[in-house]
Amino acid sequence: FGLLSGIIFVYISYNYPRKGIFTIYTIVLLLFFTLMGGAYLPWFISSISMAILADIILSVFGYDRAIPQVASWALMQLGSAAGQWIPIWFFTDRFRQDWIDKGQSAATMDAMIHYAVGIWGIISVLVVASLSMIGVLIGRKVLKKYKK
């Protein structure tokens, strides 16, 4: 998501450089997911927290500058992904059992947990951050002519 939607992020940064714009963007996105039945508290907390931090970074360092855009979008994507990782990292047994109770197999859950912790967890964080950063750089290249 971070790679593909980096263009949208850059477009908003260029054309609507207002404090709180990405916090509002995140809240609207979360509301849509809530209406579809896919939201839960850790995801809300981590997503909104990182959106607030991204808004602060952009308002202090500039909405049209590359480094603040790259850092902010990476933080927002990590915040969104952390909503998925937090239950696994801190409540592994409960997370596993809840999903088994919902019909997932124990083997599937064990594989999911394996790839969310330890070295694979670190790799996941790096991949999400890297793809988000690349998404912003692509967005800046594509939307250069639309910059106000």
Give residue spans per PLM region.
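Interfacial aromatic-anchored transmembrane helix boundaries in multi-pass membrane proteins
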Residues: 29-56
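Hydrophobic transmembrane alpha-helices
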Residues: 1-27, 31
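Alpha-helical transmembrane segments in multi-pass membrane proteins
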Residues: 5, 9, 24-25, 46, ...
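Membrane-helix interface "capping/anchor" motifs
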Residues: 10-22, 40-41, 61-68
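Membrane-interface helix-loop-helix junctions at boundaries between adjacent transmembrane segments
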Residues: 53-73
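Central hydrophobic cores of alpha-helical transmembrane segments
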Residues: 21-30, 67-79
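Transmembrane helix-loop junction
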Residues: 14-15, 34, 55, 59, ...
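Membrane-embedded alpha-helical hairpins and interfacial helices in multi-pass inner-membrane proteins
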Residues: 69-144
